[in-house]
A protein has these predicted regions:
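Rossmann-like flavin
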Residues: 94-207
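Helical element adjacent to the flavin cofactor pocket in flavoenzyme catalytic cores
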Residues: 216-266
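Mid-domain catalytic core of redox enzymes
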Residues: 227, 255-366, 456
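C-terminal segments that line or cap access tunnels to active or ligand-binding sites in enzymes
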Residues: 326-425
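Helix-loop-beta segment of a Rossmann-like dinucleotide-binding subdomain
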Residues: 154-167, 204-238
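N-terminal glycine-rich phosphate/pyrophosphate-binding loop and immediately adjacent elements
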Residues: 1-141, 442-443
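Ferredoxin-type iron-sulfur electron-transfer modules and their immediate structural context
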Residues: 498-613
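A glycine-rich dinucleotide-binding beta-alpha-beta segment and adjacent secondary-structure elements
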Residues: 186, 190-203, 218, 411-471
């Protein structure tokens, strides 16, 4: 066998599983179709501006609560710097601007001021949910999915707070709406909570299971919202670093075309270039539709199972506007994340979330500008990219989103310096999320929790994680799913699993904001800082001018060095077909930044890697 385990899909869940398994000594490989890992969590650059491709509102790094990200980095013993936002976000709901404070009583007071007729009920609701959350989530940290929770720890936790657990479990097959009706009567407050569940799990309160909503309504006020210092390049980059430092392989720019079978069991993966890799075990971190509709030959799956997968209802497709505006367009007091609710009565295309993360992280763009990324639903039928209608529809969507942002930020259109749109076609092309449904199957009653794809499949050596599985969408949830998949495989192999231990060393450092370039790499040596800053200048071009083939992966080396993954960068350098310094001068002179007279110092970076001897 080539590997102990192959992970199909390099999003956060797949990277989490792979990094934890590599640390336990398993020979691990990750396959991803993109040149950078991370799936929806990562970056691209336009000029000197860094954009987050998607997931950038990150929960799960707090000191308590559902803090799966923090646990994983502590388990990996991998340092990461994070910025904690002052509040979760601000919701612009009709004429109300509601700040989501990182303090439940303070937020309840704020909400009561917006809905005075429901003030007593609001405080009672948040008191009840907070107590249950404390008993179920905070006092019994458990980083595993419900389908993988063992009987013994479940009973132990239940006996500690039986009433809270009984209440929590009673919400399993009830809607969030039924829970809210125990407390509220005002239709407007139901519309408000509709917006919260549509943001958290892409479902309305009538659709969303109460067991998830009850946690979400509290968790984000307790744990808070975070952003990786220096951009989301660092989150998947640090997980990749852990994989490669422990001997794992990253097979990037290659798509898994099929799961191979021997004697009726998965035995490996065929890549889109025809190469085949063998492994004792597989972990799949992708959509349920691609698994049963594309990767697994119908000969090896049941017709009923394929039909079940096909019936899974997707979340709505999304569009994303990436833009740069004059700094003065964004007024003082604006939050890094602002929800813009155009229609409080219904979920429609006027509902947009604006991410202005350059407010807290000034490394993303120049001093006189801001990055603004706007994400929202689209309900139109999108033509094929090859269609003549596609550019027209794309232009219409750009105009629509710019108009939404202009209402919240007068002068936005005039101050616009750059904009680019990702359509559902774009999203599917880069992430393989079917139809551009960014959150996979909708987490709604009837296909929620245990009625979704489980960690364990009908084959004892194929495990699953990601948005299609039990816990659904969200960065801390998919991270937990990756952790559960890793533990399921470790149990099978008789190896030590990952379990929370009190007193674990903390590897997550919170940094001051606004975060600046001077703060980058401040814990690294001067020599490391110099090459990391050079590497970070790389534009990560989709079609690099410096090295024109995938075998000469200068872009991949620079990306790794920028996050401190020197072992992975040196390994990639040694894998190049020449691996000598003579060719690097030509690469450096062809660097796109050379047009301004300052190409990335590729030779300097490689000399550093050569001198490390790692």
């Amino acid at each position: 066998m080539d590997y102990d385990v192959i992970v199909i899909g390099g999003g956060l869940s797949g990277l989490t599983a792979a990094s934890l398994l590599a640390k336990r000594g398993l020979k691990t490989a990750v396959i991803d179709r993109n040149h950078s890992p991370g799936g929806s969590c990562g970056v691209f650059k336009r000029g000197d501006v860094t954009f987050d491709t998607g997931a950038a509102m990150l929960y799960g790094f707090g000191e308590q609560g559902f803090n799966a990200h923090r646990y994983v980095f502590n388990a990996l013993e991998e340092p990461i710097d994070m910025i904690r936002h002052d509040m979760l976000y601000r919701v612009n709901f009709g004429d109300k601007r509601i700040p989501f404070w990182l303090d439940v009583p303070r937020f309840a007071d704020e909400l009561a001021g917006c809905f005075p007729d429901e003030a007593d009920s609001i405080h009672r609701f948040y008191r009840d949910m907070s107590l249950m959350y404390k008993h179920v989530m905070v006092e019994s940290p458990n980083y595993t999915t419900p389908d993988e929770t063992g009987l013994r720890p479940a009973v132990r936790n239940f006996l500690r707070h039986p009433i809270s657990y009984l209440r929590f479990l009673s919400y399993l097959n009830k809607s969030a709406e039924s829970l809210l009706r125990r407390y509220f009567k005002n239709p407007e407050i139901f519309s408000f909570f509709d917006k919260l569940t549509s943001t958290y799990c892409y479902a309305t309160v009538a659709e969303a299971p109460a067991i998830l909503a009850a946690v979400m309504f509290i968790d984000n006020h307790v744990g808070g919202s975070f952003y990786p210092a220096g951009s989301t390049l660092f989150l998947p980059g640090k997980l990749e670093k852990a994989i490669e430092e422990h001997g794992g392989d990253m097979i990037l720019g290659r798509e898994a075309a099929a799961v191979l079978f021997e004697d009726g069991k998965p035995s490996g993966v065929r890549l889109d270039d025809g190469n085949e890799l063998r492994a004792e075990n597989l972990i799949y971190s992708g959509t349920v539709w691609n698994l049963y509709g594309k990767l697994v030959d119908p000969r090896f799956s049941r017709k009923g199972r394929r039909a079940w997968a096909g019936r899974q209802v997707p979340t709505y497709p999304s569009v994303v506007l990436y833009s740069v505006v004059d700094r003065g367009v964004i007024p003082e007091g604006t939050q890094p994340i602002e929800m813009l609710i155009g229609n409080p009565e219904a979920l429609d295309e006027s509902e947009v979330t604006a991410y202005i993360l350059s407010i807290d992280d000034r490394t993303l763009c120049a001093d006189d500008e801001h990055t603004v990324t706007a994400i929202g639903p689209t309900f139109r039928q999108w033509p094929a990219r090859s269609s003549g209608e596609y550019p027209k529809v794309k232009a219409q969507e750009e105009e629509r989103l710019i108009s939404v942002l202009e209402k919240r930020f007068p002068g936005f259109r005039q101050g616009l310096r750059f904009h680019e749109l990702a359509t559902p076609r774009t999203i599917e092309r880069y992430t393989l999320k079917n139809g551009g449904a960014v959150a996979g199957p909708k987490q709604m009653l009837g296909q929620h929790m245990f009625r979704r794809l489980h960690t364990r499949t009908e084959w004892d050596n194929l495990f699953c994680c990601g948005e299609s599985t039990v816990m659904g969408t969200g960065t801390p949830t998919v991270t937990t799913e990756g952790l559960s998949a890793a533990n399921a495989l470790l149990k099978k192999m008789g190896k030590e699993t990952y379990v929370y231990r009190a007193g674990m060393k903390n590897w997550v450092r919170l940094v001051e904001k606004p975060y600046t370039r001077d703060q980058l790499y401040d814990t690294s040596s001067k020599a490391q800082q110099a090459v990391m800053r050079q590497a970070l200048r790389c534009r990560l071009c989709e079609k690099p001018a410096c090295a024109r083939t995938d075998e000469m992966d200068v872009r991949g080396i620079m990306r790794r060095v920028a996050v401190g993954n020197f072992a992975g960068a040196r390994k990639r350098w040694k894998e190049m077909p020449f691996a000598d310094m003579a060719r690097l001068e030509a690469f450096e002179s062809a660097c796109i930044l050379g047009r301004a007279g300052k190409p990335v110092a590729i030779r300097e970076v490689i000399r550093f890697l050569e001198g490390m001897g790692v």
